[in-house]
Amino acid sequence: MQRSLPTSSSRPRTPDFSASPRDLGAIPFNRPFATGREIEYMRQALAGLHIAGDGAFTRRCQEHLESLLGAPRVLLTTSCTDALEMAALLLRIRPGDEVIVPAFSFVSTANAFVLHGARPVFADIRSDTLNLDEDRVENLIGPRTKAIVVVHYAGIGCEMGRIGEIAAHHGLAVIEDNAHGLLGRWNGRPLGSFGRLATLSFHETKNFSCGEGGALVVNDGNLVERAEILREKGTDRAGFFRGEVDRYTWKDVGSSYLPSDLLAAFLLAQFEAADTIQHERRRVWNRYFEGLRQWSQYHGARLPAIPDQSDQPYHMFYLLLPSAEGQQGLIDHSGVSTSLR
């Protein structure tokens, strides 16, 4: 190896290849960021005696996201996985339906629909961005196809113009699994604002975190009322608290998808520090990119590809290695912690 991987110090460190990763003090796979106001806001939630779901901090987070994405409704959920499961319920996915999903993604992208009996139809990905290959989607559409699920991998936008055209032509819903892409844009438009529905993740590995959490972005106003009902155990409880009904009752299927307001309090502090968080992530991402440029050429590895239409949120930095053989040894010797084993 000609060059060591960058570290958080100002001067790159040359690793001792005779040492173990533990001796090297491996660069961690993820280091959650704290702004300093998370505990303060959680104390405020406790003092307000409302720590269940849909409290003041939940509403503030949702309003922030609605403004950011231009969505008629955003609902915080207990995870991005739960938000995807809500999307399947909202689209009334049933056994025998088919849903097109990228062949490269986290399991939740497909699992949320398989849970309701759907058959996942896997579309190959592009070799440059690792996103769903828009040129392969149309040939996968059949009489049972109900939706196309896109994943903006590493926060790099899919080709939403072409995918939207295909979906509209065939009368299909588009769902954006935007777990990686909050604050990302495609042709100047926010990721998460293209599909009828989109999902977000606030897991500890994401740019903005509350440990475990997510959100459902409802871009189709016709789905808002039912989304609220599904999220509240199938009841019209949300309407009751707005004074729209004199009592709340069981209206539909549903589950309990509300996160505690304590988690929303933590998350709001993260949103308020967005500029600081993004500045640091951009700095680190660019340092990796520049520091690994020569190294990648020497080892035949590929760095992330960012299309001109894409404004990325600096969520993830990845390497495409030429072969699986020896890759873990190479990574271990570099003193970098990964999720590969």
Predicted features by range, described:
Residues L76, V101, F122, L216, ...:
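Conserved SAM-binding loop
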Residues M1-I51, T249-K251:
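N-terminal "arm"/small-domain region of PLP-dependent enzymes with the aminotransferase-like
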Residues L75, I100, V121, A173-I175, ...:
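Structural detector of well-ordered beta-strand residues that form the stable sheet scaffold
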